[in-house]
Structure formats: C-alpha cells, structure tokens
Amino acid sequence: MYRFAPSPTGDMHIGNLRAAIFNYICSLQDKSGFILRIEDTDKERNIEGKEKDILEILSKFGIKPEQIYIQSENLKFHRQLASKLLIDKKAFACFCTEEELEAKKQKAKEQGVAYRYDGTCERLSDAEVLNCEKPFVIRMKKPTRTMSFTDAIKGELSFEPDAVDSFVIMRADKTPTYNFACAVDDMLEGVTFVIRGEDHVSNTPKQDLIREGLGYTGKMNYAHLPILLNIEGKKMSKRENESSVKWLFEQGFLPEAIANYLILLGNKTPTEIFTIEDAVKWFDITKISRSPARFDVKKLEQINREHIKLASKERIKEIFGVDESKVELVKFYTQESSLVPEIKAKVEAIYSPKIAPDEYKNEFEIIKKAARNLKPCESFDEFKKELMGATNLKGKNFFMPLRALLTNDLHGPELSELYPLIKDDLAKILI
C-alpha cells in the first residue's frame, strides 16, 4: 500500500506532486493500492480550503486514491497508543520546561557539540512522575541499537542511537508530533511503501522505532527522492513561482506535461515524451538518480508544446474552449508558443475585430474591402493572386496589412501555411 500525505498549509509544491505521482505509479505497477492522507494536525498553519485544492490537483493528474483519511480524525488512536508506550516503558513523561531545554541547547552550542536530550526525566521514578503536577510532553526512549533501513534509491542507511535521540511524540496539549502521527497512521492504514522527499530521511528511524515500540512487525519499504533544484542549482524555495503547481497551471502548463517532466527529472526513460499510463509500463523507482535534479521551466515549455501537439481533439476542445474546426489551428500555433494562454490568444485574435496598423491603414482598408468581395479560393496562392489583382498592391504594402487583417498581428507564421486552416472561416475573420 502506497500513500500520499500532504498538509493543507499552502499551495502544493512540485516536490510533493512528484512524490504523489511516483507513489501512484508504483501502486498501479504492483496493484497494492494507493491512499491519500490529509495531515491536518497543525491547526495553526492549516489553511481553509487547501484540502479541496489538493484533491482537485490530484484529479487533474488522474490520480485516484482508493481511500481518503483525515489525520486529525485519528487523534484518539494517537493518544491511546502514546499511553501504551508509556505503560510499556518505551516512552516517558518529560517535565522539562522550554527555558530549561533552551539553556541546555545553548550550553551545547557554546561547547561546539550537537544537542541531545540528557535523559533528565527518563530517570524519574514512577512516584515522582505521578506526583508531579507540571505540564509534560511524552518522549520516545532513545534506541539502544543502531537503526537501519534499506532505501530503494539511497541504499543502506544507518543511524546511531544519539542521532535518533529521545524525541517528543506527544505535546503538552495532548496532540501528536509529526513523526508520531505519521508512524501510527501508516501502521493503522496498512501502508507498506513510503516514497517521499529526502528531507524525511532523518524521520525514518524515528518512525520505525515508534512502530517497533508498539509491537508492529509489518515491513515498511522506503524511497527518499532527491531534492529539486532551481535553474541556478539552488534548492527550490516555496517562494519561487516555479515551485507551485497552481502557478504552473496558471501559466498554461498541462498536467500531462508537468507529470511527464517530473518523471523525467533524474531518471533514464525510454522516450522523452510520455504519459503516466506509459510510465506505469517501465518506471523503476530504484533507477531514480541519487543526485538532485534541476527544474528548468524552458524544458517544461518544450514538453508542454509536444503534449499539445499530441492531444486528442476532445482534449484540445476542453483545454482551449474551441470547437472542432479550430483544433488544427491550435496545434498549428505550437510552432510559435508552448503555453495555453498564448496559443489561445493567437487563435482568438484571428476571430476578433481587426485593428488597422498605423503605417498601413489605407492599404488595410483596401485589402479588407477587396477580400470581402473575392470568390472562395482553395489555395493561398490563388487567394494572394486574386487579392493582388484586385488591389494593385504588392510587397510589404500587401503582405503586412494582409497579415494584420487575418491575424491581428504584423508578425507570425507563414500565411501560406495558415490559410488552409482558416479559409472556410474568412467571412467571420474579415471583420
């Protein structure tokens, strides 16, 4: 069972989307199932409506979870299982105040050593714990052995006990920390394979330790994806437009193209242009590069252009809001643009009232009047010949205003290539 577990705290990052796509593809390959879990326990950072945004984005990519879980609905289980760990002496109550902990952290910093919890409260007797009325958190006891796991991308990874430390699993307000809620939920929901970003590598031994402490014996597999870099080779910040899936949609990138590019990054694929359905046939999570990959919007534009060219008539009609007669015109304009709004604007300009260029106003009106009176012409050569004869214009004085009349622009593709696509609509265009 695979899962995607985003938090509703902001716009979806392309790194998160990449993880969702990889999890979904792998679930289709081994038919083990795919679930969505909304990790909404951080009430202060949650943004209303983001759960809906997550579902809508996944839907655009054709990602269909078999089950949707809301993490906060598992709170009673989190509390019950934290209590079990206390009873079983796998965890302990910690009464250390923030001020006390901060002083210890500062001392470690001054000594030039990494801070580790010193076990103060772990040494308290049961009587001392029961008689203490101070607020407390629950800490998982530091492991007594090296914690190891095999990562499908990074290979064998090991963490010494001090690196895992005695970490907090329940806050003083009786809400779970990320690692505890995540570990428990994966266990309860039957997750067996976790594909996520490499920023979670250090969380993995903690989550494994929690499940071990609860007596869970199910095997968990992991694959931690290298981070995505911007074009300058720096880690992509959430403040960068390109990192937002919503922004990419707004710019006119198709879900098909975005998915294609995210699968392509740091991967050796049999072809450059493909769909998620294609990738299911050959994708191998173990072949993902261990090195970070650069996200290049220009490359994504090229891929977007190819997906527009390959799109079915129905898909073009859906994306661009055009009827069937304009489908080939849309694809024709991919030679000039790769983004939906740009192509849409060029097509709409052809069917909009035309504006005469200042330097060709007189010629524009002459050509417009003559063109309206021409008999239908099958080819551009015939159309050009008839129109030149009727207007006595030639060269720039003919072609520039003619282009403006047909496209509302003085620059663009070859009119001889455009004409076959619009000849049947000349009556609508010559306005």
Curated annotation (Swiss-Prot):
Catalytic activity as recorded in UniProt: tRNA(Glu) + L-glutamate + ATP = L-glutamyl-tRNA(Glu) + AMP + diphosphate
InterPro entries the UniProt entry points to: aa-tRNA-synth_I_cd-bd (IPR045462), aa-tRNA-synth_I_codon-bd_sub2 (IPR020751), aa-tRNA-synth_I_CS (IPR001412), aa_tRNA-synth_I_cd-bd_sf (IPR008925), Glu-tRNA-ligase_bac/mito (IPR004527), Glu/Gln-tRNA-synth (IPR000924), Glu/Gln-tRNA-synth_Ib_cat-dom (IPR020058), GluQ/Sye (IPR049940)
Residues that coordinate or bind ATP: 238
E.C. designation(s): 6.1.1.17
Pfam families: Anticodon_2, tRNA-synt_1c
Keyword Membrane on entry: no
Biological process, per Gene Ontology: glutamyl-tRNA aminoacylation
Compartment(s) where it occurs, according to its Swiss-Prot or TrEMBL record: Cytoplasm
Motif 'HIGH' region: chain residues: 6-16
GO function terms (MF aspect): ATP binding; glutamate-tRNA ligase activity; tRNA binding
Keywords from the UniProt entry: Aminoacyl-tRNA synthetase, ATP-binding, Cytoplasm, Ligase, Nucleotide-binding, Protein biosynthesis
Location of the motif 'KMSKS' region: 235-239
Keyword tRNA-binding tagged: no
GO cellular component: cytosol
First-listed, main subcellular location of the protein, grouped into a coarse class: cytoplasm
Biological function: Catalyzes the attachment of glutamate to tRNA(Glu) in a two-step reaction: glutamate is first activated by ATP to form Glu-AMP and then transferred to the acceptor end of tRNA(Glu).
Family: Belongs to the class-I aminoacyl-tRNA synthetase family. Glutamate--tRNA ligase type 1 subfamily.
Subunit record text: Monomer.
Name the record gives this protein: Glutamate--tRNA ligase 1
Organism: Campylobacter concisus (strain 13826)
